[in-house]
Amino acid sequence: MKFFVDTADVKEIRELNDLGLVDGVTTNPSLILKSGRDIIEVTKEICNIVKGPVSAEVAATEYEQMMKEAAVIARIADNICIKLPVTLDGLKACKALTSEGHKVNMTLCFSANQALLAAKAGATFISPFIGRLDDTGINGMELIAEIRTIYDNYDFRTEILAASVRTVNHVKEAALIGADVVTAPPATLKALVKHPLTDKGLETFLADWAKTGQKIA
């Protein structure tokens, strides 16, 4: 499984990348707003830090404007992945862009039907939103499972990018189902390493080691 970090915070991205935990980055208009920076400027900086795909989203809803904005975004760096909403215009733009060799991340996916159409349009990634579905009382993981089955049935190459991930359990469940990628906020990715028994065991080992009076280096 690949880990993408869902943020436009360059400091956080750099820290996680230095740990070897980042395979890519996802951003959206809300995260750009939170960063307080120009979208082109911050996206270019992120692309220079991370070797993997960096998703940057168009802010248009109609095909022609989507294509214009996508052209600007695509020029930022070679590892750019253009992010489009799963709409009819978005699907049309996806088909056109992937035909030109661009990577495309279809976002705001809330149904298996949407994921099927995205794969037909040649999307590189499909981003089903787990947490937002959970908020409506629907189990978001069931959607991941449905998409996995459909993609496996027809050998689609579109990768399932589990998004709107809020907890470490979301990550575990997505991995068990077979999502190709999880994108999560920095805090969630860092929390994956945490376990109270690890902390307790380390404390015991260090205390016992101190009693030996030895040094390794």
From Swiss-Prot:
GO biological process terms, alphabetically, are:
carbohydrate metabolic process; pentose-phosphate shunt
Q: Where is the active site?
A: K83
EC class name = transferase
Keywords associated with the record:
Cytoplasm, Pentose shunt, Schiff base, Transferase
Q: Which reaction does it catalyse?
A: D-sedoheptulose 7-phosphate + D-glyceraldehyde 3-phosphate = D-erythrose 4-phosphate + beta-D-fructose 6-phosphate
> Principal localization?
cytoplasm
EC numbers on record: 2.2.1.2
Q: Which Pfam families match?
A: TAL_FSA (PF00923)
The record's GO molecular-function terms, alphabetically, read:
aldehyde-lyase activity; transaldolase activity
Q: Which Gene3D superfamilies match?
A: Aldolase class I
Q: Give Gene Ontology CC terms.
A: cytoplasm
Family according to the record: Belongs to the transaldolase family. Type 3B subfamily.
Stored HAMAP family: Transaldolase_3b (MF_00494)
Q: What does this protein do?
A: Transaldolase is important for the balance of metabolites in the pentose-phosphate pathway.
**How is this protein named in the record?**
Probable transaldolase
Query: Which species?
Result: Brucella canis (strain ATCC 23365 / NCTC 10854 / RM-666)
